[in-house]
């Protein structure tokens, strides 16, 4: 007995030392017992393949912890991997290899504790139970005991008072003025306007060489470690109705691809450049996280660009991975992802005790998002409209075997709030996935207290003068699609024109580029755009900076005054223009952004540059050309603001990236259509005349008489029938069409008109009224009758 006790004590001590677990207090040896399921709830599904799954869809485990018995209820994490999931490695020659494994089964689960309302779990069952679970505010780590054949596990209790537990910090990059401090009094009001639709974030993970070296044995150890982190992140973000899925990972197994230094801002800048110029060209994702295992002399545990989600250069973050506890690293990933979604650190008055909140400064795994974080996230959605997280990465055919309880409204269901023990929605019957009697809706901006709001109730307020308020229809729980004023609608008392729901001005752009109250500089500063260098140009073609023409000066590099530059964004340049006679000095400041393929230092497209003129790709052009329509650029009628007619509203997402190219393409398309219609029209007229001629010639007549166009009211003898459609002879883009018009004299100019005229008894001619001689296209009417007859 004593020998056995000493053995287990040695095992426990060696296990703790090997794992190096921090932020925990004590441990308890447990023997999880697998329980039979009391019900299947439609879990026996038909799979597309005949390959049986090794891991069950639903599990129950009994864990006796202290004096309590916990029943752990687990459901396999669905849509855990994106449909385009990939894994990338490098060989010893530094050659890159990417594979797309078709993983049909996995051992990662999420769930809760039965009979505990406030509980959650993120567990893998690959080799025993490993992961995180909580009951109320108390959090636990469970792991199998190494070298044990009897199913022993260790359960650690996270200690919020442990010294290390308050040592978590990250680099706090400045938020723009749009991410202002939250007014706590309006928190509930903002939550009432919550966006209920599920969001999707395709997460990609990059592991540096140090992480690889520590986790390369056994071969799949690092894969399972990354999967465990993402499973934890997904569990946390489900509380915001965000589904985080793993798009793939890349392992720098043959050396780091960037320089990783103690200054995390510099490391983030290097990583953002690499992922934009290299990774994005071979992989699609919404956000990428670099896990760095390099020992850096800094207490900072991570860094991210504030509000950077869906932005090519800024949707990335760096997280230090020096601890063996997957849950703590997953918590850091969730924290940095929160910054990318517009969330700031929790502080007064939104303090979050006991390390419970994701955006707090605790190191142990968090439980939830604070009210401030939720409000900041909702405000970010309204202001920035990040489109990438609205895209469901799973096609319909990928979402197999529907069942009641999967939190998706499948065919035949009215609602689905998840498993019975997890459902908290008062409107939905979780057993049958139907609405409870007397209720008409479950959720949505136009659903209140399980009843649809009346027609005309405002469900989305206009955010600015270029936006339009949306109202409920009375028959749908969802708010209608977000629409806004037509592009070109005057805004800010004539200072600008609306563009895609915003009113872009140079003053606002300056305040975003520079910190501390910058505004547009004097108009004389824009003369510097004639220089044709990186601090003054209108177009960037390769490595050549094209100087601005006179008319385009205010659409080149933007010049500001006041504020201070942000070294994080790029390099600034200041000019001092001095007027000796008036003894006046004008300061002109501009910025050249680092590693940015689309230079945001140029004046934004849609910014006013004259009456009826806007900037477009470094040029000042008329609004009709910029927006490719005189209709959409004209203001809406007073009574038509709220309807869906295209002349008054422009849909989101219809922005033309290259206006010039789109305009040329549209012009060619219009010319092709006009040519085809003219050719068809001329052919039909000729065919009709020939047919009528045949009919008249077949009639037996006693004496020749004048044939009048009785049936064809458009034809009269000795009168000209004139077509009003212009013929476009400039048809060089369509050589095959031009060949069919070889008989048309080259002297014809466009536009001109075709005149049909009676030339003789047996022939008809097509004549140009400007020509002295008719061009006759003689037709053999007799042979034509035989062919038609």
UniProtKB/Swiss-Prot annotation:
Role according to the record: Required for normal male fertility via maintenance of epithelial cell morphology in the caput epididymis and subsequently correct epididymis lumen structure required for sperm development. Plays a role in sperm motility, flagella morphology and tyrosine phosphorylation during sperm capacitance. Plays a role in normal expression levels of HSPA5, ITM2B and ADAM2 in sperm both prior to and post-capacitation. This is a non catalytic metalloprotease-like protein.
Recorded GO MF terms: endopeptidase activity; metalloendopeptidase activity
One Gene Ontology term, aspect cellular component: plasma membrane
Location of the Disintegrin domain: 401-487
This protein's record includes keyword Glycoprotein: yes
Tissues where the protein occurs: Expressed in both the head and tails of sperm (at protein level). Expressed in the epididymis (at protein level). Abundantly expressed in the apical region of the proximal caput epididymal epithelium, with decreasing expression in the mid and distal caput epididymal epithelium.
Positions on the Cytoplasmic side per record topology: 690-789
Extracellular-side positions: 24-667
Protein name: Disintegrin and metalloproteinase domain-containing protein 7
Disordered, as annotated region: 764-789
Database matches in InterPro entries: ADAM_Cys-rich, Disintegrin_CS, Disintegrin_dom, Disintegrin_dom_sf, MetalloPept_cat_dom_sf, Peptidase_M12B, Peptidase_M12B_N, Reprolysin_adamalysin
Subunit architecture: Interacts with ITM2B in sperm; the interaction increases following capacitation. Interacts with HSPA5 and CANX.
Composition skew (Polar residues), residue ranges: 772-789
Transmembrane parts of this sequence: 668-689
Alphabetized SUPFAM superfamilies for the sequence: Blood coagulation inhibitor (disintegrin) (SSF57552), Metalloproteases ('zincins'), catalytic domain (SSF55486)
Annotated keywords: Disulfide bond, Glycoprotein, Membrane, Signal, Transmembrane, Transmembrane helix
Residues annotated as glycosylated: 84, 167, 174, 583, 628, 664
Cystine crosslinks: 310-388, 350-372, 352-357, 459-479
Entry's induction text: Induced by testis factors and androgens including testosterone.
Any Pfam family matching the protein: ADAM_CR
GO biological process terms, semicolon-separated: epididymis development; epithelial cell morphogenesis; positive regulation of flagellated sperm motility; positive regulation of sperm capacitation; proteolysis
Disruption phenotype: As a result of decreased egg fertilization male knockout mice produce a 15% reduced litter size whereas female knockout mice are unaffected. No difference in male gross organ morphology. Reduced epithelial cell heights in the caput regions of the epididymis, resulting in increased circumferences of the epididymal lumina. Infrequent histological abnormalities can be found in the caput epididymis, such as sperm granulomas and mineralization-like features. Increased frequency of intraepithelial vacuoles and hyperplasia found in the cauda epididymis.
Propeptide feature ranges: 24-176
Signal sequence interval, chain numbering: 1-23
